[in-house]
Amino acid sequence: MDVHNVEMVMSAVSASQYPTDGKPEIALVGRSNVGKSSLTNTLIQRKNFARTSSQPGKTQTLNFYDVEDKLYFVDVPGYGYAKVSKAQREAFGVMIEEYITSRKQLRGVISLVDARHEPSEDDISMYEWLHYYNIPILVVATKSDKISRGKFNKAESVIKKALGFDNEDSDFQFFSSETKYGKDEVWHWIEQHI
């Protein structure tokens, strides 16, 4: 998709604050600092539209980005950040669960993992949870520019094995915000699901 018009329309913490115009939504989930904002910025061809931060846990609300008046990207708070209080983690969990299990406009979830590492327990739990609710999933292995292309097959195998990857309802893509590798493939998946 050629993107010229993007607007962050709202930050929400509950269903009463979600957009009401019925546009399809694609949610982005992953650990803190896995690259959700960088993926968003690359997809919409903007450098700093979605705020990136070296400080994990920056996103604390569901951020809705209207893309070309056709769909919303929904940036979900990162999980697994130790310095967030237990109460805050629980509140994030409730907010995310409410959104993912009840939002009819949600067409799919892009679940980000770090290409350099085996998925964390949180990554695995998120994948299993999305799979349980029959939500289409694109697993995006970010920071792929940090590993050689010759190691892609091994990295993909490690990630898929750890997640218990199901080829029936899930897809997989390497991605780099530095080189833009995988950008077109991610857009193709999004367009198939909206």
Swiss-Prot record:
Residues noted as binding GTP in the record, renumbered to the chain: 30-37, 57-61, 75-78, 142-145, 175-177
Residues that, per the record, bind Mg(2+): 37, 59
Names of the cofactor(s): Mg(2+)
Domain of life: Bacteria
Keyword Magnesium applies: yes
GO CC terms, sorted: cytosol
GO molecular function ontology, one term from the record: GTP binding
SUPFAM superfamilies documented for this protein: P-loop containing nucleoside triphosphate hydrolases
Alphabetical keyword list: Cell cycle, Cell division, GTP-binding, Magnesium, Metal-binding, Nucleotide-binding, Septation
Segments forming domain EngB-type G: 22-194
Record bears the keyword Transcription regulation: no
Pfam families, per the entry: MMR_HSR1
GO terms, biological process: division septum assembly
NCBIfam families linked: GTPase_YsxC, small_GTP
Record-stated family: Belongs to the TRAFAC class TrmE-Era-EngA-EngB-Septin-like GTPase superfamily. EngB GTPase family.
Function: Necessary for normal cell division and for the maintenance of normal septation.
Protein name: Probable GTP-binding protein EngB
Organism this protein belongs to: Leuconostoc mesenteroides subsp. mesenteroides (strain ATCC 8293 / DSM 20343 / BCRC 11652 / CCM 1803 / JCM 6124 / NCDO 523 / NBRC 100496 / NCIMB 8023 / NCTC 12954 / NRRL B-1118 / 37Y)
